[in-house]
Amino acid sequence: MEKGIHYIENVFEYNDLLGVETLHPLVSVIDLSKAHPMKHVRHIFGFYAIFLKEVKCGDLLYGRQHYDYQEGTLVCLAPGQVIGIEDNGEVYQPKGWALVFHPDLVRGTSLGRNIREYSFFSYEVNEALHLSEREREMVVGCFLKIRQELEHAIDRHSKRLIAINIEMLLDYCLRFYERQFITRSNVNHDILARFERLLDDYFAGDRAQREGLPSVKWCAGELCLSPNYFGDLIKKETGKSAQELSLIHISEPTRQE
C-alpha cells in the first residue's frame, strides 16, 4: 500500500479512531462534532461511507488530485477508494455527519441487490453533491432515523429496518443528484460540447478503425471525470448513453457523403 495511507478495515476500527461508541458491528452514524480532534490523514475504507461536511475543510485529496471541499457537501465512497487530506501537522475538530456501513450489512437485502444502481458511490470528490439547506435537513433526518434504530437493541428486525432506511437516504441522494444535473445545465452543456469535439477528433483519423469505439472510461478520463459521473451526465442531458452517441457519430459522416 502507498506510504501515508491508513487502511481502516471495519466499522469498529473507524469508531475507535474517532472515539465513539459502536452500537452495531456493521454500521455506524457519527456526529463528527463529538468525535476526537484528529490529524489529517489519507484513508482507504473497507466499507461504504457517506460524509456530510458542515465546515469548509480545505483541500481534500482524492486519489492524487486536490479538491476544495466546501461546506454542505455530501461525498459517497465505495470500499477501496482513497480519500483524505495530507498530514500537515495540524489537529482539527471535524464537523458534520458520517454514515458508514459494511457490505455484509446489506447482503441479501433489497439494497444489497441494487447497490450498483447508486453509481454516485464511484463519483470523484469534485463531482460531489452540493446540498441546499432543505436537502441537508432531509439528509440529517435520515442519519438520525438510522441512529435511532441503532440505539434499539439488535433483534431479528434490525438488519432489514436499517437497510431500508439507508436505501431511503440513497434514493434521496439520487433525487438530489438529478436536481444538481439540472441546475448545472450550463456546465453540463460545456461537457457535452467537449465530448462531441473529442469524438470529432477520435473519428477524424483511423483510430476508430484500429481500436473500435472509444470506451466510456477513456472518454471520461479525457474530460477529467469519473466514468460513472460522465455516463450519468450524458444520459441525463441527451437521453442516450455515451456509447449510443458514439455510434450516432460514426453514421453522421456517412450521411453527409
Residue ranges and their predicted role:
Residues D59-L61, I83-E90:
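Short beta-strand His + acidic residue motifs that chelate non-heme Fe in jelly-roll/DSBH
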Residues Y69-I83, V100:
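Conserved metal-binding segment of the jelly-roll/cupin
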Residues N88-H152:
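A hydrophobic/aromatic-rich effector-binding and dimerization subdomain
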Residues E137-D200:
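An amphipathic alpha-helical interaction segment
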Residues F195, L199-F203, I234, T238, ...:
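Short hydrophobic clusters on alpha-helical segments that form packing/core surfaces
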Residues L213-I250:
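Basic/polar phosphate-binding segments, predominantly the helix-turn-helix DNA-binding elements
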